Amino acid sequence: MSLSKVSVENSLKPEKFVKISWVDKLLPNYFSILKYLSITDFSVVKAQSYESLVPVKLLRGVDLTKHLYVTLLGVVVSGVWNVPESCRGGATVALVDTRMHSVAEGTICKFSAPATVREFSVRFIPNYSVVAADALRDPWSLFVRLSNVGIKDGFHPLTLEVACLVATTNSIIKKGLRASVVESVVSSDQSIVLDSLSEKVEPFFDKVPISAAVMARDPSYRSRSQSVSGRGKRHSKPPNRRLDSASEESSSVSFDDGLQSDHT
């Protein structure tokens, strides 16, 4: 048994992190969009220097070949100090996404643990998704910084254990057409025939606002937007426009300069 297996199993219940509908509770797993996996395996790391960045396998035992995305719903970090009770100091512990250049930007969660607290367990809700191909490369690490712990070099003052709850899925876009159609039918991950769902498809297109950035670059969208904004009328599709080389070139320009990375 792991150091905190009992508490981890209780802390990683899916209902503690997401709202589970009655459909998800009743339907078999193969009808559910999200596949919840409570991971009871653990990764134990030992901090042995002033500052350590130790890789951890958060998705040990998870089959990532059947789905495109992995959502990190909950993380429980537990620890035990391997020093006498009279020991001073403590440690700063952080779970880091090492895909980012900067540790500060990649920090998912962070906490401090004084050495006077013999055992501890901390729960976090990251709630963000990564592509399964990235998850296969185990991009997560534990960053540990010891502070004023009077232990000699080469010894192990702190043992940490990490467990997590994840959801695997083939779609993470919650405001798209597919999500709207799926929600109106059943919570199914199967393919959907859109021809028989025109009453759901057409209102979706009518209510989606056109981005101001798009309208600024192509004023003709204004007239098209107004032509489909009327209610109670059935509108035909706007005619397809051939994009010339200039408009194709402008479409490749980023709409939000703030999304560009400062890293070189």
UniProtKB/Swiss-Prot annotation:
Keyword field: Host cell junction, Host cytoplasm, Host cytoskeleton, RNA-binding, Transport, Viral movement protein
Pfam families associated with the record: MP
Taxonomic superkingdom: Viruses
GO CC terms in record: host cell cytoplasm; host cell plasmodesma; host cytoskeleton
Main subcellular localisation: host cell
Localization terms from the record: Host cytoplasm, Host cytoskeleton; Host cell junction, Host plasmodesma
GO annotation (BP), single: transport of virus in host, cell to cell
GO molecular function, one term: RNA binding
Basic residues: compositionally biased ranges: 231-240
Region listing for Disordered, in residue ranges: 221-264
Family, per entry: Belongs to the tobamovirus movement protein family.
Job description of the protein: Transports viral genome to neighboring plant cells directly through plasmosdesmata, without any budding. The movement protein allows efficient cell to cell propagation, by bypassing the host cell wall barrier. Forms a ribonucleoprotein complex with viral RNA. Binds microtubules and modulates microtubule stability. Can bind double-stranded DNA.
Protein's recorded name: Movement protein
Source species: Cucumber green mottle mosaic virus (strain watermelon W)
Gene from which this protein is expressed: MP
